[in-house]
Amino acid sequence: MASLKLTKNISNRFGCTLSEFWKALEESPNSMGYILGALSELFLKKHLESKGYEVIRIVEKPAGGNDAKSSEARGDFYVRKKGSKNDAWLVIESKGLKSNSEFRGKKFNNWEKVFRFLAPLAFPKKGIKTTIYKKGYIKYTKAKIAWKANHSGKRFPAFSWNRTNPGPISCDLTGLWKNRKDLELYLSSLPPKAFTEKSYRNCCGAVAVLETHKPNRRAGAKTGKIQAAPLVADFCVLAIDLFLRTGKHEFVFANPHELSHSPTSPEHLYQNYTIDVLIPNKKKARPIISPPWYLGYKDCVKKTKPKYRKLDPTQVDHRQD
C-alpha cells in the first residue's frame, strides 16, 4: 500500500515512474544531495523531539526574501526544552558529510596517498598541536595586517583558537599501527579496488573520512570579508548527520564558537572539518567522537554553553501548520 502511494505521488508531482525518478536522482548528484539534506533535517527533528525538545522549523526564505532573513536565525530549527515558557532558544543548523571526500581529484586513489594522509594522524609529532596553533596564528596575522592596511582605525576580530583542539582535524589514530612501516605494509597489502571511487562510495575503501561540508558564501559583519563558509555567529549548535559514512542517520554536535574558525577570517568557520577517520578491518566501524564534537546534543549544550536567542516570529516556517 505504501509503495503504491509513493508511486502515485511521484507520478502526480513529477510526471514519471518510480524507476525514472530514481534514475534522475542517480544522474544528478546535486538533487541527491538536496534530498539527503532534507532527510537529515527530518531525522534531526525527530531525534531532538524524542529527547524531550520542542523543535520549530526556521523558514529558509522569509516574506521579503533574503533581505528579510534575520542574522539570528541562520539555522534550520529553533530548539528548547519541551514545557519551557522562556523565550530562550538555540538555533540549530543541520549538515551532512562530504560525499566525495576520499576520491575527489583522485585524492586517495593509491596506497601512497592514503599513507601520507594517515601517517601524521597515526604518528603525530611531539608538540604537533602547538605547531598547528602557531601556523594558524601566522596565517591570521598576515590576514590581519593585509586587512588593516585598507581599513585604518578599524578592529580586526581576535584569533580565538582553542590550544587543546587547534585546526579543523579532530581525529586521533594513534595505536592502530606499531610504526610507519607497519602502516605502509598494511596499506600496500590492500587490493587495488580498495582505492577506487566505487569502494569509497560504498564505504568499503581503504578509509572512510567523516568530513563536514558546509559551502555557504557569507560576508563577515565586521570585516566584510567573503568566504565560502558559514559565519561563526550564524547558529548556536551545528549538527552533522553521519549517514554517508556509517549508514545510519545519527548525529554529532558542536558549538561553532568551540570550533577553530578560519585563520584568515575569524568571523567564518572552515568549510570542512574532519571529525574522524574509519579504517575497515583495522578500527571498529563506529566513529570515535572527541571535543569539540559531541555524540549527544544535551552533552554539547551542557559542556559548551552556547548563547540562547529569542524566537523571531517572522522567521518561523508555517508551511506545515
Q: Which residues make up each language-model segment?
A:
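Active-site beta-strand-loop-beta-strand hairpin of nuclease catalytic cores
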Residues: 71, 78-94
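Catalytic cores of nucleic-acid endonucleases
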Residues: 88, 95-247
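Conserved hydrophobic/aromatic positions in well-ordered beta-strands
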Residues: 78, 239-241, 252
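A short catalytic or substrate-binding loop motif that flags glycine-/basic-rich loops and adjacent residues
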Residues: 68-72, 231-232
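Interdomain/boundary linker segments immediately adjacent to catalytic/signaling cores
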Residues: 1-56, 60-70, 81-83, 102-104, ...
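Extended hydrophobic/aromatic segments used for targeting, binding, or gating
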Residues: 73-76, 99-100
